[in-house]
Amino acid sequence: MNKEIKVAKEAALEAGNLILSFYKADYEIRDKGYHNPVTTADHASDNRIKEILVQSFPEYGWLSEETVDSKNRLSNERVWVVDPLDGTKEFIEGVPHFVVSIALVENGIPIIGVLYNPVTAELFEASEGNGAKLNNKNITCSSEQNLSSMIILNSRSETKKGLWDPHIKTFKELKPIGSVAYKLGPVSYTHLTLPTIG
């Protein structure tokens, strides 16, 4: 799996650099459906990731949020699962809470995960049996059990609606983050405790 994690990181970094070239610049925005925008940055990132991963591993399947699904992937033991720009709304708003998200799934079980935030230069990686890393340094999850000491990564939209107001004093801190994938990376830090996905 060393080659897979290396190539996945390379793809995430290259896609992240592409995304940065669009960030706070001019790009096209389309609506895929209910509150689900897509930009030219999403598509450019998707194309680059696919080019790198499929060229390196042509025998693996491909599933991406921005690519038309092919049922052929179901016959593959290993499948790349990609969101080329998770947190598109945040990207559009200029909020640096978005990531490139790449996973490798084997027979339905995730065995590799890579997240890259190109604005903060945070590169998260995890692979089966090897733990998690942030920018090549080992990281571990918090063992905190006291609610008043926990930092909670919660939904930006739920925060705007006031849904977290009753819990403000329950936790040490509430940190609103829009991207679901981006919430999953920082929980690997010892000082961040729990993502909420709503």
Segments from the language model and where they lie:
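N-terminal subdomain of lithium-sensitive/metallo-dependent phosphomonoesterases centered on the IMPase/IPPase/PAP
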Residues: 1-85, 166
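Residue-level signal for inorganic ion chemistry
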Residues: 19, 42, 53, 88, ...
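Short, glycine/acidic-enriched loop or turn micro-motifs at the edges of active sites
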Residues: 68-69, 86-89, 120, 196
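Short loop/turn motifs at secondary-structure junctions and domain boundaries
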Residues: 71-75, 94-95, 116
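Short, well-ordered alpha-helix to beta-strand connector turns
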Residues: 76, 171-172, 192
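Glycine-rich active-site/cofactor-binding loop and its immediate structural neighborhood
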Residues: 81-113
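Acidic beta-strand-loop-alpha-helix segment within the catalytic core
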Residues: 103-185
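Single conserved hydrophobic/aromatic residue that forms the stacking wall/gate
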Residues: 191-198
